[in-house]
Amino acid sequence: MQRIIQFFSQRATTLFFPMALILYDFAAYLTTDLIQPGIINVVRDFNADVSLAPASVSLYLAGGMALQWLLGPLSDRIGRRPVLIAGALIFTLACAATLLTTSMTQFLVARFVQGTSICFIATVGYVTVQEAFGQTKAIKLMAIITSIVLVAPVIGPLSGAALMHFVHWKVLFGIIAVMGLLALCGLLLAMPETVQRGAVPFSAVSVLRDFRNVFRNPIFLTGAATLSLSYIPMMSWVAVSPVILIDAGGMSTSQFAWAQVPVFGAVIVANMIVVRLVKDPTRPRFIWRAVPIQLSGLATLLLGNLLLPHVWLWSVLGTSLYAFGIGMIFPTLFRFTLFSNNLPKGTVSASLNMVILTVMAVSVEVGRWLWFHGGRLPFHLLAAVAGVIVVFTLATLLQRVRQHEAAELAAEK
């Protein structure tokens, strides 16, 4: 018995904490991906307008912005552990509450509360991983977490489409609530504490000062711009693709689910390449090799749909190529933005996520407007413009990171 206890205590941080975080993150993804094939059915069940379908995603993202300003500084002061555990509890209750919704408004409110899981996971959970492990190990562990979690967008639509042939869509949220409860138990048992509680008092003045310092940091600003813009091609596709492929394209929910597999599968493959084959994912040479892949995907989106229009081929192929390219470097960009400064990491992470989620929520609404008022090409043009700008912000980010590292080395000498 003592050996069993010793086994679990030794592996709590290195194994069971990442597993619990993965389950929490996986469940949060499923609230969108499992229901996306049936989101048109949800709208019809509540007798709402079909144009509200993408709002399920945009309000989820808005929920992800709601508490960022509080959770980062709070976790810097009272600890990462109590904040993340509270988030898992709120998420579980919000998923269970969806079972009781009777209108589209209630459903969207529940989606907003579910979206707060982004605040807790990204602001507190990912930072804990980065703090608990060294640079290369943390990057590779984040790549593993991302790969496993992104199975949700692959199997989520397929599973959701299959399950909705047998059960009501609300049952899916009941399943996710159970997953959230299991993640909550895992975090209670295994999550480490990586900050000293009470080292800095919590006050409005100190919080505002930390945020001011973050938003004055040039590396943070460049990294936040790079990361947020790089999300736009994929998030706009995730949000608007049900309308494009099911409502306008005539696809069945099963066909729609299969059409999403290449996009998220590309990110998973990219992350596995980083974990298994790349010795140092922070090398500029490796990072720049991913850029032509991203640009080829964006070119495919526009040229394919312009020259040989197809209901899904060029959209899926182009988005998949882009996803593969950005998936190879995303964990590294996150690490650069978070740790290339001496600022409180919870506040840095909160600031980063506020920027990313604001850009994502706005891009979803802009993408929806472009689709309904301009069609396929203007919609994909949004992704192309964002992807091209990323190349320039990435170059600036790498230059500033090199300057920061050189300054640190000089200071040590």
Swiss-Prot record:
Broad class of where this protein is predominantly found: membrane
Residue intervals passing through the bilayer: 15-35, 52-72, 82-102, 107-127, 141-161, 171-191, 226-246, 255-275, 290-310, 311-331, 352-372, 377-397
Membrane side Cytoplasmic: residue ranges: 1-14, 73-81, 128-140, 192-225, 276-289, 332-351, 398-413
Pfam families: MFS_1
Inhibition and activation profile: Efflux is inhibited by the ionophore carbonyl cyanide 3-chlorophenylhydrazone (CCCP). Activity is inhibited by extract of milk thistle seeds and reserpine, a synthetic plant alkaloid.
PANTHER family in UniProt: MAJOR FACILITATOR SUPERFAMILY, MULTIDRUG RESISTANCE PROTEIN MDTM
CDD domains listed in its UniProt record: MFS_MdfA_MDR_like
Native organism taxonomy: Bacteria, Pseudomonadati, Pseudomonadota, Gammaproteobacteria, Enterobacterales
One GO term (biological process): xenobiotic detoxification by transmembrane export across the plasma membrane
Entry keywords, A to Z: Antibiotic resistance, Antiport, Cell inner membrane, Cell membrane, Membrane, Transmembrane, Transmembrane helix, Transport
GO molecular function terms attached to this record: sodium:proton antiporter activity
Subcellular location: Cell inner membrane
Membrane topology of the entry: Multi-pass membrane protein
Stretches assigned to the Periplasmic side: 36-51, 103-106, 162-170, 247-254, 373-376
GO CC aspect terms: plasma membrane
Protein role: Proton-dependent efflux pump. Confers resistance to a broad spectrum of chemically unrelated substrates. Confers resistance to various compounds belonging to different classes of antibiotics and dyes: the fluoroquinolone antibiotics ciprofloxacin, norfloxacin and levofloxacin, the aminoglycoside antibiotics kanamycin, streptomycin and gentamycin, the quinolone antibiotic nalidixic acid, the amphenicol antibiotic chloramphenicol, and the fluorescent dyes ethidium bromide and acriflavine. Does not confer resistance to benzalkonium chloride.
Protein name, entry field: Multidrug resistance protein MdtM
Effect of D25A: Abolishes the transport activity. Retains the capacity to bind substrate, albeit at a lower level
Protein family membership: Belongs to the major facilitator superfamily.
